[in-house]
Amino acid sequence: AIDPALAPAYGLAVLDALEAAGHEAWFVGGWVRDALRGAPAHDVDVCTDAPWEESERALVAAGITVHETGTAHGTVTAVVEGKPVEVTTYRVDGAYTDHRRPDSVTFVTDVREDLARRDFTVNAMAWHPRRGLVDPFDGAGDLERRLIRAVGVASERFEEDALRLLRAVRFACRLGFAVEEATQEALVEAAPTLGDVAQERIGAELRGIMASGRAAWAMRAEREVMLAAVPELAAMVGFDQR
């Protein structure tokens, strides 16, 4: 369980503002994952059943500055004490024809539907200081098992956004986790699709892998993905690419 004392005041201010206006809101994603590990991040993301226009209205009414940062996907950014808090309406994603972003999103009213669109089980949890944890895919169990596991069918998650291949490796590196078996099979199979991902997106994930101190592990354990991301690495690892 997460100690409510770990929740930062700037995040709670956003929850309170939304709930005061009659909406439901949760902390979601990376903050929840890291707080369960006892190492909460500074970045707080909030999801809510409020449409973004109503989120903005509720936050502004509470004296919070709001920037319209991604309204097509239901996202605004609240700034409290100089800290940005992303606030996103619960949504499900349509088809990803460009393997990067959904062509369309549908806003929904159940947080569980929102969690189902996320990449890995450890990132698909929501938490509230009074209502506790919502964890439909046993992300907390995978944290204990030290596993990176795709939500639902792994191949579908990677087909939606090929960058998730590198995100899986980066999270495994950063957390010191293994990749779950079915997820690993899907990673290897989908590796060639990384060729379609923009270099700057790949670069950002690779920097995270390097910063983790486990890049050598990534080259050994996730060779197919790493070589698909950076074909030039093949020469360094003495890998016969015939």
Annotate the PLM regions.
Residues A1-R242:
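Catalytic cores of the polymerase beta-like nucleotidyltransferase superfamily
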